[in-house]
């Protein structure tokens, strides 16, 4: 079928349906470097304004750090803009292996392999190490990139209820006839901000002869005593078989991801993982900046400690104001609003108050689970947090949601 008027109208009707359902996503144009204070043009064509950013993955405030920028610039001058090649042809510079070795040391694993993104890492790892005689058993709230990666793999699939260890044990028992069992989980769940029970998961893996996979993208650099991740926080360093993470959040915020873990698994990814074999290498400028990031966070926990203090202050302030929050300790603090239109309307009003915090709704989260996901950074100063709490309180009072839970919000606004 050609792209005729009928097809065009069909697509337009689909888009109209998304708008009518209140599920249409808009982009905001940022006209400054990533930071706690940013300049945003919203809506498109409007005059830009300075706002406080509460929705970036810039957990350690390193995205625009002068030393990271300087290292990236030096890498650009020394190693060039790009390599115009995949890794195994002529796309591996010595700095790529340097970064992989630094990540291995920091994460406490045996080896590491860089990918263009963590989504690519998750898309490639399962197919590379599992076959149709194996089983993947995943938490039901794993990241979308994991879901997509599992779809590309020939191994059988099953799920367990979110963070329900009894259900996981049942599934592991059920699948004892499979050749290999792989438990799959996020370290920190990106929408809710809660941490996986990795200590129990590792115990179950040993009991039922399974391997463990963790995507630690929302933890690497700041969760755990020295910021190594959820596996450090849970006391299971050395017990995770496959760990994926990103350079696009706390570790500089640019792009790039990796598979880290058992040496044989990493080598199989080097030989078989299609996103690794058929994608351009991570650019030298990003590699150079990421090496400097690891130097900064390996030498001091100051930023990680500040992030933790900021998170406690922010969470306590929102709770005291009467917002319905998801429980947790991570810098992802979701303000639960349940109704998609309510989340979008409050987000727009917060923007008018100088606060940039985006509403999340289906299909990013399940229907009836809309929220404003706030994210805290070590780059936030006290005045940023206080201004944010004041604006949230003002907008919350306007919509009458303070002190309300899901049942009351549903009665007032519907789902």
Regions found by a protein language model. Name each.
Residues 108, 132, 152-154, 208, ...:
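Short, structured coil segments at secondary-structure junctions
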Residues 208-211, 218, 223-329, 342, ...:
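Active-site C-terminal subdomain of aminotransferase-like
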Residues 69-117:
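Conserved N-terminal alpha-helix of the aminotransferase class I/II PLP-enzyme fold
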Residues 66, 70-74, 78, 101, ...:
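PLP-dependent enzyme catalytic core of the Aspartate aminotransferase-like
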Residues 58, 158, 162-214:
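Active-site phosphate-binding strand-loop segment of PLP-dependent enzymes
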Residues 8, 12-79, 210:
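N-terminal "arm"/small-domain region of PLP-dependent enzymes with the aminotransferase-like
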